[in-house]
Every structure is written in structure tokens, then in C-alpha cells.
């Protein structure tokens, strides 16, 4: 049995940028009770507004959003907020992985991903 405890010892802010309600629910269920303060927005404009007022430790960023592609937003996050860690999630094939990582994503997870993959990714980023 694998122990998947998270490194967070105090409340860490995590912003979820995802427009699909079902995926938001899954992410919230996975991270609920794990010492995180979870916030959620459904598009890039809302994410930009959020980041101007809040500084999450981690952004979980979907690629395909109503107002653009998350992969294109990564550079803006890294330029303006270089300490924020980014986990890019995408249902597209892994060809997006290289672009996402080149643009500054710290982790790329292809949908569907496991709870353990998400835990391990966040754990590593918060060390």
C-alpha cells in the first residue's frame, strides 16, 4: 500500500482553472481535506483576475478553456508570478506535453490521471 500524504504542513492555496464541472468535482474530491485552500475559476480571464489579487502555491491549469488555451497562458503566469508552480492537465495527446513544459509548466498530466499521480506531483512541487 502506497502512502500518498502531501508535503503541505500549513494551508497552501491551489487555484484550479477548469471549465468542465465533472473534472472540477473530481479535483476537489481528490484535494479536499488535504490542507489546501482550493479556489476555482472557469476561464483564463478569471484566472488572470484571480492571480492579480491572490498568490496560490500551485495552479492546476486545463488546456482547452472557453477563452483560449492554457498552454498559451503558462508563459504569462511564469513571467508575472515566477514562484507559482503549474500543473498542466490535458485530454489532448502527449504532443502538448513538450509545448507545455517548454512554456514553463512544472508538471504535465494527461487525462485521465490517477489520484496518486496528482498527489505525487503536488507533493514534489511543494517540497
Question: What is the role of each PLM region?
Answer:
Residues 62:
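Active-site residues of response regulator receiver
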Residues 1-15, 57, 116-127:
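Non-catalytic signal-transmission and effector/linker regions of two-component phosphorelay proteins
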Residues 40-58:
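Acidic, metal-coordinating helix/loop segments flanking the phosphotransfer/catalytic sites
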Residues 18:
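Conserved acidic carboxylate
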Residues 43, 69-72:
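Acidic catalytic/metal-coordinating carboxylates
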Residues 72, 92-109:
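Alpha4 helix (beta4-alpha4-beta5 surface) of REC/receiver domains from two-component response regulators
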Residues 21-39:
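Two-component/phosphorelay signaling modules centered on CheY-like receiver
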Amino acid at each position: 500500500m502506497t502512502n500518498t500524504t502531501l508535503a503541505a504542513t500549513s494551508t497552501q492555496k491551489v487555484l484550479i482553472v477548469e471549465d468542465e464541472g465533472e473534472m472540477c468535482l473530481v479535483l476537489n474530491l481528490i484535494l479536499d481535506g488535504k490542507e489546501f485552500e482550493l479556489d476555482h475559476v472557469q476561464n483564463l480571464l478569471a484566472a488572470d483576475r484571480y492571480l492579480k489579487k491572490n498568490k496560490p502555491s500551485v495552479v492546476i491549469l486545463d488546456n482547452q478553456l472557453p477563452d483560449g488555451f492554457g498552454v498559451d497562458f503558462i508563459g504569462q503566469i511564469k513571467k508575472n508570478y515566477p514562484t507559482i508552480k503549474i500543473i498542466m492537465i490535458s485530454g489532448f495527446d502527449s504532443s502538448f506535453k513538450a509545448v507545455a513544459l517548454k512554456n514553463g509548466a512544472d508538471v504535465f498530466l494527461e487525462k485521465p490521471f490517477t489520484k496518486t499521480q496528482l498527489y505525487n506531483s503536488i507533493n514534489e512541487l511543494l517540497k
